[in-house]
Amino acid sequence: MHKYDVVVVGGGHAGCEAATAAARLGASTLLITHKISTIGEMSCNPAIGGVAKGVVVREVDALDGIMGRAIDRASIHSVVLNGSRGAAVWGPRAQADRKLYKKAIQEIILNYNNLTVKEESVDDFLIESDSNGESYIKAVITDSGERILTSRVVLTTGTFLRGVIHIGEQTTPSGRIGDKPAIELANTLKKYDFKLGRLRTGTPPRLDRGTINWSVLQEQVGDNPPTPFSYLTEKINQPQVSCFITHTNEHTHRVIRENLHRSASSYLDNVIAPRYCPSIETKVKKFAEKNNHQIFLEPEGIDDNTIYPNGISNSLPIEVQYEMIKSIKGLENAEILRPGYAVEYDYIDPRELFHTLETKKVKGLYFAGQINGTTGYEEAAGQGIIAGINAALSLSQKSFVLHRTDSYIGVMIDDLVTKGITEPYRLFTSRAEYRLAIRSDNADRRLTQKGYDISLVSHERYSVLQGKLKSIKQLEEKLESLTITPEQLRSYGIKISYDGIRKTALDLLGYPNIDWNKLREIWPELNMGSSVSYLHNAKAPLPVIQVADTGIQYLNDDGMDAVDTEKNVDSSVMCWNNTITDSIAKNEIYEAVAIEAKYKPYLVRQEADMKFLQEEVNTQIPTNFNYSQIKGLSTEVIEKLQSIKPATIGIAKQIQGITPAAIVSILVYLRNKKTKIAANSA
């Protein structure tokens, strides 16, 4: 009978991060998966990252996770979403070559120290109770009846728990097309009294590249040079490809409307789908006034003929999918290689978990990924690494918890275990009240030291961080040594407060309209070095919460983050001296120093605003309060608040999907209304 310190069930994005994290901490780890050949499979879209999601990938990488390095070995189209806005909303995203990504993950997993991989299914657990009645894991039981002894299990089942695929009226028990579901394991969880719910998601049809008329489509070129995800990657080596854009039209919508009754969405109304990744059927129904919807045609590989049409996920019958596709510009002759489908599956109530992702019912049992009600590769990876870390650390009675103040992973896990979910959970910057501090550019500076302190992070990664921190300090000290008076600044066309106080170059860099080129004009000794690019024209950080105004103004009304793929680049920024080593990208150092300088005053205000929120938790909300009269609240927020009718701000904060921005907007509205009433009665 075999015995392992940690057993991870499931070889998806959560499982791979959990298994490698536990192994890095020295735990003898077993990864059990249905098929070794599908480890690292990108089941839905062939891309990693995005707004908020890209930050999570960087955070996983900062903890020595594997997703960032794998996507860097597979990236074929890279873009920084929101690149022309403040760094707090930058969203690195990379289109992947599916084969290269899977190959990269498998090469890492199958050659990892302390990690064994086994091809089998887990159907049951051996759970015992101690004298206090506390249940704990003793073993996992496979479908062949084998017992594998372990005291720590991480369950990362994805969409496989009682998974069912729907294509029109046809249904097939499956967790992913071509793969069987985990029926017995779902029954086991039910047997041990875990509260199960049902969710669904979907995927679009895959198209044949050679049957698409590319000449009539809008080309979307990626960033040049492409931006790596991993802090250990110097550059992306794969050839880069373009994506293309087309749109649905009235004919497309008519085809969909006439066949809605044949879609799985018509009989799965009680099974909630992702709000922010809706099917084309949902878009046509919910946004009937829209004449078209955008579709991104994304290549699935450099030498792969498969095209992923992002934006038309559906579960219509195959013949209807053909009719729909052929109504779209450029796709008139397109052939479908694989139909789109919906998949419904079980999830557990994440409120049954601690912040370590250990279950409250069974000691030593951890859940990570879509089983917790989340959606997305990145969210799964973020949970997986935390579950794997804690499974290993708990063997010596230790734990590792990230917080809302230090990471998006911390925001996500706190949301899940305290608020639960009512629909598939997806990360947005609007969910993070400390988003000005937890950005994509500083994940290593936030988390790598924490990982190193628990022996999770390699010496190589830690050395890279130390070199980077040293270079940042050197540059900041250089800038602080250069001073100038407000009077002298006027000769350079810079007008600031005429207070007679000398300003350092670092002070000036914090001003919205002062960049590196302006500093070089003032101080020629900041001479040109090797050419590097710097996002110096990116907009200054937008104002953080203003409690005297109307709440947070820089979040979208629909609760999602705006996507802006434009990035302003200046390739002629200087390097002030040669002490910044060649092994550290000089543009990273300049970027880090400038961002910190520009965000410094806003971070101070952010702290004050968060303190304000904490102090106002007992503020009463009128019973029949009309939330729709508050500008800036999303439809989701209004619906939930009108339904639940929270009595206080503190209760409203605990509702799943209610963002910090929404809470501030409500507080400001109530306070302004109270002030008006007082003024009128005076």
UniProtKB/Swiss-Prot annotation:
Q: What cofactors are annotated for this protein?
A: FAD
InterPro entries in the cross-refs? FAD/NAD-bd_sf, GIDA_C_N, MnmG, MnmG-rel, MnmG-rel_CS, MnmG_C, MnmG_C_subdom, MnmG_C_subdom_sf
Which Pfam families would you find in this protein's record?
A: GIDA (PF01134), GIDA_C_1st (PF21680), SAM_GIDA_C (PF13932)
User: Which GO terms label this protein's molecular function in UniProt?
Assistant: flavin adenine dinucleotide binding
Q: Which GO terms describe its cellular component?
A: cytosol
Q: Localized where?
A: Cytoplasm
List residues binding NAD(+): 273-287
General function of this protein? NAD-binding protein involved in the addition of a carboxymethylaminomethyl (cmnm) group at the wobble position (U34) of certain tRNAs, forming tRNA-cmnm(5)s(2)U34.
Q: What is this protein called?
A: tRNA uridine 5-carboxymethylaminomethyl modification enzyme MnmG
| Natural source organism | Wolbachia pipientis subsp. Culex pipiens (strain wPip)
Traced from the root, the source organism's taxonomic lineage reads:
Bacteria, Pseudomonadati, Pseudomonadota, Alphaproteobacteria, Rickettsiales
Identify the coding gene.
mnmG
